């Protein structure tokens, strides 16, 4: 899964897809518990415009256009998007309400109330394992609206907080249990592209847990990968996905000897909730 990073303006969507991405990531900012914009703000990755944005509802409607067969904007290879939900400043009550609002927003503006909406898979990424109530409420809303089937298209990522230190993987697992999530788990690790590359110790730990007999992780992705050398290192560690500002870099590496026989871009027929067994 090759994810275009920080794709927050609708005009950026075809640019990243044409550069080779089969998925995108967008940053969803809130006013209180209301998802309002796809917007990152400053600071952000080096070399990027941090202030590109769109209204949340319009952004989802545009994603629907690009992922609905028969639509003039349809891209067959666009199969997944990650919503990086900026819930860090919300209290517990707001987190629950935010889960409700995001569920209703996706249902109306992306899934078209279950009537021939967009077909892409969705990963909901939350910055704090304490925000598991967001996921519980999200799921409850879709069930109450009669669209529990759409949960087949939804995965979850709980990846923080980052300060004072990242939570242990056991703590992350417990949060998923509290959220009522068994499967459909994506877990990420990474650094902004202007930070020095570390030893990827946590990434290796996540991959090891994914591959263990009692692993709770479906897929592992790494961000922000913009260098050829970092791409090769991440692939060697065994990631399932890479998030990048420059999709063509990853495409180039995937076509190199040593990688083209081991890796390929995911297609719609590949199950993003199924752990790949070597």
UniProtKB/Swiss-Prot annotation:
Write out the GO MF terms: lyase activity; metal ion binding; phosphoric diester hydrolase activity; toxin activity
Q: Which cofactor does it need?
A: Mg(2+)
What Gene Ontology biological process does one annotation of this record name?
lipid catabolic process
Q: Which Gene3D superfamilies match?
A: Phosphatidylinositol (PI) phosphodiesterase (3.20.20.190)
Q: Which cystines does this chain contain? A: 44-50
Its annotated function is as follows: Dermonecrotic toxins cleave the phosphodiester linkage between the phosphate and headgroup of certain phospholipids (sphingolipid and lysolipid substrates), forming an alcohol (often choline) and a cyclic phosphate. This toxin acts on sphingomyelin (SM). It may also act on ceramide phosphoethanolamine (CPE), lysophosphatidylcholine (LPC) and lysophosphatidylethanolamine (LPE), but not on lysophosphatidylserine (LPS), and lysophosphatidylglycerol (LPG). It acts by transphosphatidylation, releasing exclusively cyclic phosphate products as second products.
Tell me the protein family, please. Belongs to the arthropod phospholipase D family. Class I subfamily.
In its UniProt entry, what is this protein called?
Dermonecrotic toxin LlSicTox-alphaIII3ii
**Species of origin:** Loxosceles laeta (South American recluse spider)
Where is the organism placed in the taxonomic lineage, from the top? Eukaryota, Metazoa, Ecdysozoa, Arthropoda, Chelicerata
């Amino acid at each position: 899964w090759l994810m275009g990073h920080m794709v927050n303006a609708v005009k950026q969507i075809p640019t990243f897809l044409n550069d080779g991405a089969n998925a995108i990531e967008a940053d969803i900012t809130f006013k209180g518990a209301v998802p309002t914009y796809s917007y990152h703000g400053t600071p952000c990755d080096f070399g990027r415009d941090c202030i590109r944005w769109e209204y949340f509802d319009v952004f989802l409607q545009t994603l629907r256009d690009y992922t609905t067969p028969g639509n003039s904007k349809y891209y067959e290879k666009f199969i997944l998007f990650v919503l990086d939900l900026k819930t860090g400043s919300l209290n517990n009550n707001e987190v629950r309400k935010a889960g409700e609002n995001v569920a209703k927003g996706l249902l109306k503006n992306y899934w078209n109330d279950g009537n021939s909406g967009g077909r892409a898979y969705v990963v909901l990424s939350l910055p704090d394992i304490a925000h598991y109530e967001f996921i519980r409420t999200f799921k409850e809303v879709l069930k109450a609206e009669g669209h529990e089937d759409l949960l087949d298209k939804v995965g979850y990522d709980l990846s923080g907080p980052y300060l004072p230190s990242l939570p242990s993987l056991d703590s992350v697992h417990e949060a998923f249990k509290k959220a009522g999530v068994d499967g459909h788990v994506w877990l990420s690790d990474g650094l902004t592209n202007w930070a020095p590359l570390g030893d990827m110790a946590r990434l290796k730990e996540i991959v090891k847990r994914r591959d263990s007999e009692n692993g709770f992780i479906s897929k592992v992705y790494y961000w922000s990968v913009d260098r050829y050398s970092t791409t090769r290192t991440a692939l060697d560690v065994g990631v399932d996905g890479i998030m990048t500002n420059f999709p063509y870099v990853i495409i180039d590496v995937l076509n190199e000897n040593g990688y083209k026989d081991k890796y390929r871009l995911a297609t719609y027929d590949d199950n993003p909730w199924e752990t790949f067994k070597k």
